[in-house]
């Protein structure tokens, strides 16, 4: 392993120590919580920073696995318009990633969804079996 790969692995492990990044792929519906920092200037001229969290929910149409620069593209429909946003997987701005639904698709990149609307843009849902535990058997 060369120095750059070692450096990337250190940064990825630092990022994943605080937040768990779930396994997801193209076709899955995810809810990404993003940290937003607002700057406002008070009357006395001082700058005030406020943090807030904003949720962005949509379908993952592309995923790019490239170490520390990994990213994924999420598409949602907002007020009748398609909105796409790319998130860096290991960015400190991304507070959490939650998988809402797992989808069944046959492609790695779902760019064809840009040209579709309504029923033709739907994705089948993949049902994941729940692990059997001792409590479930009893």
Curated annotation (Swiss-Prot):
Keywords associated with the record: Ribonucleoprotein, Ribosomal protein
UniProt xrefs under SUPFAM superfamilies: Translation proteins SH3-like domain
Gene Ontology biological process: translation
Domain of life: Bacteria
Stored PROSITE patterns: RIBOSOMAL_L19
One term of GO molecular function: structural constituent of ribosome
One Pfam family matching this protein: Ribosomal_L19
GO cellular component: cytosolic large ribosomal subunit
InterPro entries assigned to the protein according to its UniProt record, in alphabetical order: Ribosomal_bL19 (IPR001857), Ribosomal_bL19_CS (IPR018257), Ribosomal_bL19_sf (IPR038657), Translation_prot_SH3-like_sf (IPR008991)
Function: This protein is located at the 30S-50S ribosomal subunit interface and may play a role in the structure and function of the aminoacyl-tRNA binding site.
Family in the record: Belongs to the bacterial ribosomal protein bL19 family.
Protein's name in the database: Large ribosomal subunit protein bL19
Gene: rplS
